[in-house]
Amino acid sequence: AIDFLRRVNLGETPDIGPAAAVIGGGNAAMDAARTAVRLGAKVTVVYRRSRDEMPADDEEIREAMAEGVAFRFLAAPAGITGQGRAEELRVELMELDARKKPVGTGRFETIPVSAVISAVGQKIDLGGMQDIATGSGGRVTGPERRPDAHRATSQRCGWSRRRTSP
């Protein structure tokens, strides 16, 4: 998903065709899905767990739904078929066990697609920002304070600070 988003941000218009599946449930998946909708595709996000287990921010999910993104929960990719281009995404239907772990049911469905975008386990290239401290999930960490009138910053981004040497 990161490469797809980078290409679009650089002004390219990737040919994803009329129907795309985005695999994953995080914010990168929501960004890729919304971007694909804006490129004219009918988009389905495929996630192996339920809506409650999605790591994406609730706001991101709501905005994706408002833009027309469809969601297929409890489905794990099992294969892609097509001649020279994706035509179908085969998914195995899942169930959550007592510990909320997805378990395959042995039942399958196919989703018609012209492109499949993977948004699983995305990592960004920090290129030159290796000293910025991050916490779980790669989020920037820093002091618990709000920006003042002279140091405005994005509330989502938070404050960044240099990592202390080990």
Which ranges hold each PLM region?
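A Rossmann-like FAD-binding core segment of flavoenzymes
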Residues: 3-17, 38-137, 141
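N-terminal Rossmann-fold NAD(P) dinucleotide-binding loop
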Residues: 29-30
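Short FAD-binding loop at a beta-strand-to-alpha-helix junction that anchors the flavin cofactor
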Residues: 20-22, 143-166
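Gly/Ala-rich phosphate-binding loop of Rossmann-like dinucleotide-binding domains
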Residues: 33, 37
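Glycine-rich Rossmann-fold phosphate-binding loop(s) that bind the pyrophosphate
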Residues: 24-26
